[in-house]
Amino acid sequence: MYKRQIHTTADFDYAQTLHFTPGAVAAGIAAMHAGATIITDTNMALAGITKPGLAKLGGQALCFMADPAVAAAAKQAGTTRAVAAMHKAAAEYPGAVLAVGNAPTALLTIAEKIENGLRPALVIGVPVGFVNVVESKERLFAVCESHGVPAIVAMGRKGGSNVAAAICNALIYSAAEMLDPTARGWK
């Protein structure tokens, strides 16, 4: 996991800032083996996920940010599309892997949903930036830990859609290699 993040970003800080709840990597690999649906908060993260490898495991990756219904729901509720997209993800794919690389508001929505009973297979929380990023990551990690929800979170200000995709790919490649050690990630 660390290797893929460092390779993706050329940033060795991920060896210290990437945090895992107990069993998070195993839960992520198990989700991939079970044909996970991965929901991202950006089309950029979606584009970075290896679709052939995920499809061979029976999974799919989706992003609702460009969904007209999500835009309408966000406008009606006076919130962001990221929040509305996570509401849709929770309603339609409650056991999905949620991969957030951009929107702290998405992390806060996921944390609230978990407190109200949502149990995603895994939450990947790696938004990048300055506004509410650190706080949203810390809250998400604490909520996931206290509710037994697997999570991988890049603490601090670093992260991004590329990091979210790289974590997803590390899980996909690990799952593929467990099924066939010669597969080398099924690229």
Across the structure, where does each feature detected by a protein language model lie?
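Conserved small/polar residues in nucleotide/adenosyl-binding loops
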Residues: 1-5
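Feature captures the catalytic cores and cofactor-binding loops of soluble hydro-lyases/lyases
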Residues: 92, 106-123, 127, 132-135, ...
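A short, well-structured juxtamembrane/interface segment
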Residues: 16-31
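C-terminal functional extensions of proteins
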Residues: 131-187
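Short glycine/serine/threonine-rich phosphate/pyrophosphate-binding segments
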Residues: 45-48, 104-110, 130-134, 160-164
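Long, charge-dense
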Residues: 54-93
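Buried hydrophobic positions in well-ordered alpha/beta secondary-structure cores of metabolic enzymes
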Residues: 41, 123-125, 167
